[in-house]
Design a protein with these regions (language model features):
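Short amphipathic, positively biased membrane-proximal segments
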Residues: 1-142
Length: 142
């Protein structure tokens, strides 16, 4: 694995591991923030009513898959797990389209777009083929 692949995996995966661990340890504030979005999702997906449990489960996925990606273990699988986790996290955590205050709306839009960029990076890793891929990163060298 080349140095850029190692660094990229460590930065991308490590960020998820840290944020996920925080959600597992202290889910209350995130559960409150996610509550309205979870209610919307429950209209089409049968989720448990315990918002803190859902935040903890999502955090555990991010912690485990983030750590795996950070060390180059199953990078494509880890990236897919993180991508699947990031979509509801972004929808629930950064609904800038619902915010009236211009400054808060701009801040939440920035966070939404940051998550979209992270999702893009995860999709690059998940979609990279094995042939010609940088060892352990899933990212094509060409």
């Amino acid at each position: 694995m080349n140095i850029l692949g190692r660094l990229g995996g460590a930065l991308l995966g490590g960020s998820f591991a840290v944020f996920g661990y925080g959600a597992v340890r202290d889910p209350a504030a995130l559960a409150k923030l996610a509550g309205p979005a979870l209610e919307e999702i429950r209209k089409v997906v049968p989720l448990p009513k315990d918002d803190e449990l859902l935040v903890r489960v999502n955090g555990a996925v991010q912690t485990g898959a983030g750590a795996a990606l950070a060390i180059g273990l199953f990078p494509r699988t880890s990236a897919l797990a993180l991508a699947g986790s990031l979509i509801p996290t972004t929808y629930a955590g950064h609904p800038f389209w619902t915010i009236e205050d211009p400054a808060q709306r701009k801040a939440q839009r920035t966070q939404f777009l940051k998550n979209a960029a992270m999702l893009g990076g995860l999709l690059v890793v998940a979609g990279a083929g094995r042939k010609g891929a940088a060892s352990g990163t899933g990212i094509s060298a060409g």
